[in-house]
Amino acid sequence: MAAEQRRSTIFDIVSKCIVQSVLRDISINSEYIESKAKQLCYCPASKKESVINGIYNCCESNIEIMDKEQLLKILDNLRCHSAHVCNATDFWRLYNSLKRFTHTTAFFNTCKPTILATLNTLITLILSNKLLYAAEMVEYLENQLDSSNKSMSQELAELLEMKYALINLVQYRILPMIIGEPIIVAGFSGKEPISDYSAEVERLMELPVKTDIVNTTYDFLARKGIDTSNNIAEYIAGLKIEEIEKVEKYLPEVISTIANSNIIKNKKSIFPANINDKQIMECSRMLDTSEKYSKGYKTDGAVTSPLTGNNTITTFIPISASDMQKFTILEYLYIMRVMANNVKKKNEGKNNGGVVMHINSPFKVINLPKC
């Protein structure tokens, strides 16, 4: 019986985002392609060709182009993906050929079979390149973090280093991009421009963890009309670096925010008139859950978005033309890979010629000098 292929939750999310961004302007049910894409992580070399051919066959069977205007719209979306194709010559040959077919309507209609074959090949080229790049980076990240050949102290240090490195990535790179603010440079004042990408990432990791960017982002989202009252995810993820106060202190305020109503100012009731018992219990449950996470009673690591349903990739923060949905996800995966490599180098044990001593601690061993 063949061994079951390892799956990656991270890659399942990333691959779906990649597929939907590439097929954004194409009328096709992408579920089959998404299921095929997920197979490319931890995929043996002998199986990759079959998976990629399955993606092409699905495109060939389902993609239809009605007119040259539709083709031009599709090409406008595909152009930005050229940066993630290993052989740019292949990309531009296919892309420019498709552009030529839009010269006249008669030429377009006559050559439609050739156009479809060319477009299907271009889409498969982009998808397979981006998915394989993403799979390689996700595999590196997961293997680095899940490696069993580490002492407990090294594993703890690396997990914490990576956690706060990712928090800084969100605070200094992703959130400023979403709200349209200038991205803060990770280097220190007076330094020469950084030529080493690893050094740039290292400085990003050294920037202060506590910033105002989360509150600034909430203000931005509130101006866009998005409900920002439920911020449990920020506490769990470590983005909102604040102590959670007692439930009783903030329950009326939270309920008032959700209801968008003034609190009745009398001694008999501290709740808005249009809040029922069910809503009060829901708010209480949410805050109780936050408190449990903050005290470590719940350690499942689950994080859900406070802004959307978070059921599918399409329920991300609903900002139109978001770069994250278009093509930059691979750049951020690469930054995460460099971060993981930097964390590994920082915490790798060096042979100091000492003696390993076993102790009755969860960390099990310490190194002592030879005496």
Curated annotation (Swiss-Prot):
Entry's localization field: Host cytoplasm; Virion
Keyword Phosphoprotein: yes
Site feature (Cleavage) residues: G187, F188, G238, L239
Keyword line: Host cytoplasm, Phosphoprotein, Virion
Induction profile: Expressed in the late phase of the viral replicative cycle.
Highest taxon in the source lineage: Viruses
UniProt modification remark: Phosphorylated on serines by F10 kinase, phosphorylation state is regulated by H1 phosphatase. Undergoes proteolytic processing during morphogenesis, probably required for the transformation of immature virions (IV) into mature virions (MV).
Primary localization: host cell
A cellular component term, taken from the record's GO annotations: virion component
Record note on quaternary structure: Part of a complex composed of A30, G7, F10 kinase, A15, D2, D3, and J1.
UniProt function note: Late protein which is a part of a large complex required for early virion morphogenesis. This complex participates in the formation of virosomes and the incorporation of virosomal contents into nascent immature virions.
Family: Belongs to the chordopoxvirinae G7 family.
Protein name: Assembly protein G7
Organism: Vaccinia virus (strain Western Reserve) (VACV)
